[in-house]
Amino acid sequence: MSNPVTKSPNSDQSISLLLNELKTVNGHFLIVADENWDSVNWVDFLNHSSCNVSIISNRYDIAQKAETASISTYFNDLDFSGFKPKSFDGIFFRVSKERANTHHVINQSAYLLKPGATLMLSGEKNDGIKSYVKKACMLFNTSSIPTKFGNQYLAKINISEPNNSKKLDDSNYPSMQAVKVLSEYGLTSKPGVFGWNKIDRGSAFFVDHLPTLMSRFKQSPRTLLDLGCGYGFLCYQAKFFDIKNITATDNNAAALIAVEANFKHSECNVEIVASDVGDVITKHFDTIWCNPPFHKGFIIDNDLTYRFLEATCRLLAPNGHAFYVVNSFIPLERKAHGLFSSIQLAADNGSFKVIALSNA
C-alpha cells in the first residue's frame, strides 16, 4: 500500500488512493461510487487497470459516466440484492458524508465478499475513517491499521465470517420511514436523502414566502419543476396553489424513491425523473422551484449553482417565474446575471435568501 496518490484537479485524493490500488490487483471488484467520485475519468481508469470492475452508484450522473465508459454499472439506492452472494474479491469504498450510507455499505460487504476477500476503505480523519475501520474490524473479527497518505487514510480489511451482533447501525437504510417533524405534512423519508430526517431550514424559509412569490402570477401556473427535489418537501406544497402537473427530478436514487412514495396517492399528475441537473428534461415549466446544493460529497463545487441556473434558464417557460433559496453567502444574483432579465431578492433572513428569476 505504498503507492503514491495520483493527483488531478479538483479530485478527491481519498478516491485517488483507491484507484491506485485498483491498478495493482486482479480479480472481480466492486466500486461503491457516490457523489464523491464525480471527477473520475473512467476511460483513463480502464486504460490503467486489468481487473474486472463493476460499479454501483446512487448518483445518476456518476452512473452515466461509468456506463459511457462501458463499465458494468448499476444505478440504484445502494441496493446490493442484485449481486450474487460472495461474488467479489474486493469492495472499494470512499466513506460517505452520511453515516447511515457508510454503515450500510460495510454491513452489505459481509454478503458480497468472498471468504478472505478485502474491504478497502479510504477517507480523511475528519470524515470518521478511523472509527469506520474500527467498527468494520469488529464486525469481521479482524484488525487493520489505516495507512496515512498526507491527510488521507487507506485501510485494507480482510474479511472473515461476520459477527452479526456487531452489525453497524444503518438507520434501517432500505426503508421509507415516518419522521416526526414531517408527519404534519404527511411526508415520509429515508436514509440516503440529504437531510432525510428533518426539514431543511432554507426550504422552510422558502415555503414561508411561497404565497408572496406565487402572487407574481396573473394566472395560477399549471406546471412545476422541482429541480433537485430531495424527498419532495418543496413540490409537496404545490397542492396549496392548485398546480396539477409536477415534475420532480434529482440525481440521488434515494431521493427519487422517497418523492415517489410521498406522491403515491396524490391527485396531481406527477412525473419523477432521474437526471443530472435536469439534463434529460426537454419541456418547459410555468414555475421552477429550487434549493440547490453547493457541495458534492465533502468538496465545495463552485460551478454547481451556475449549472442549476443554466438548466432553469433552459427549462423555464417564456412567461414563467423561477424561485430559488440559497445560503445568504452564495452569490446567486451575480451568477444569474446574463441568464435572466429579472433577478430580484424576495426575502433574506441573514442565513438564507429567496431569489425570484424570470425572462418575462
Feature annotation, model-predicted:
Residues Y74, P146, T188, E271-V273, ...:
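General small-molecule cofactor/ligand-binding pocket signal
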Residues S8, G150-K218:
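SAM-dependent Rossmann-like transferase core, predominantly class I methyltransferases
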Residues N3-S72, R201-C290:
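Conserved SAM/SAH cofactor-binding pocket of Class I
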Residues G90-A100, L227-G232, F285-F298, T312:
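Conserved proline-anchored active-site loop of SAM-dependent methyltransferases
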Residues N101-A178:
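N-terminal auxiliary segments of SAM/dcSAM-dependent transferases
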Residues I106, M120-F140, T147-N151, Y231, ...:
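Conserved Class I SAM-dependent methyltransferase catalytic core
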Residues L78-F83, V277-I281:
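Short loop/turn elements that flank and shape the SAM/SAH-binding pocket of Class I
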